[in-house]
UniProtKB/Swiss-Prot annotation:
The organism's place on the tree of life at top rank: Bacteria
Listed name of the protein: GTP cyclohydrolase 1
Keyword Zinc among record annotations: yes
Region (Disordered): 1-21
Protein family according to the UniProt entry: Belongs to the GTP cyclohydrolase I family.
UniProt GO molecular function: GTP binding; GTP cyclohydrolase I activity; zinc ion binding
Involved pathway(s): Cofactor biosynthesis; 7,8-dihydroneopterin triphosphate biosynthesis; 7,8-dihydroneopterin triphosphate from GTP: step 1/1
Enzyme class: hydrolase
Length: 229
């Protein structure tokens, strides 16, 4: 039998605690670096601006929980506004095809999030996008990418809806485009009137979707139909 030296158990527990604390600190540092991402998002002016905002609300940017917050906010804003650094040409990358299809193509329930340009608070929802091709069709994923590109900018929902429709008209020259967006706005939920559960619905109808009531009704009927998935 091995006899433990007096106090050795206490020392062992202290060593274990020190090791655990060191590991937690390392894990937090690793998590922070991963959250910031590997791409270079450093922007001293933006970081300084976030620090100024933190001081303005009475916080200390140098306290432990906030030391990396300015960099994280800058990284998040760059991601949420990445649509400014994209173009339709690069996005589509020649994914337009001659198919001779002339019936409605509908991509519904495309999830989206964007930042309201008035308060920089998010609005979150889904888009339904349809078009009737003359000759050219586009890969379905590219429609979702177009929604994403315009969403990742400072926006108002009305303009976002119109921009998606105009983009498809520009690249496909179809008989028409219909876009409906349903979204809930945090600027109405977290502040102001504070109405949780309210939704804003906007539409943009171009070409036959505006001119032909039957085409418009077919589109609206299809997006009202419950999904089977």
């Amino acid at each position: 039998m091995t006899l433990a030296k007096p106090g050795s158990g206490s020392q062992s527990r202290m060593d274990d605690k020190a090791h655990f604390k060191s590991r937690v600190i390392r894990d937090r540092a690793t998590f922070a670096e991963e959250e910031l991402g590997s791409s270079d998002v450093s922007d001293p002016a933006m970081v300084a601006a976030v620090e100024t905002l933190l001081r303005g609300i009475g916080e200390d940017p140098q306290r432990e929980g906030l030391r990396k917050t300015p960099e994280r906010v800058v990284a998040a804003l760059k991601f949420l506004t990445s649509g400014y650094r994209q173009s339709l040409e690069e996005l589509l990358n020649s994914a337009i095809f001659d198919e001779g299809h002339d019936e409605m193509v509908l991509l519904r329930d495309v999830s989206l999030f964007s930042l309201c340009e008035h308060h920089l608070l998010p609005f979150i929802g889904k888009a339904h996008v349809a078009y009737i091709p003359k000759q050219k069709v586009v890969g379905l994923s590219k429609i979702a990418r177009i929604v994403e590109m315009y969403s990742r900018r400072l926006q108002v929902q009305e303009r976002l809806t119109r921009q998606i429709a105009e983009a498809l008209m520009e690249v496909l020259d179809p008989y028409g485009v219909g876009v409906v967006i349903e979204a809930t706005h945090m600027c109405m939920v977290m502040r102001g009137v504070q109405k949780a559960g309210s939704w804003t619905v906007t539409s943009s109808m171009v070409g036959v979707f505006q001119e032909d009531p039957r085409t418009r009704e077919e589109f609206l009927s299809l997006i009202r139909h419950p999904s089977n998935f």
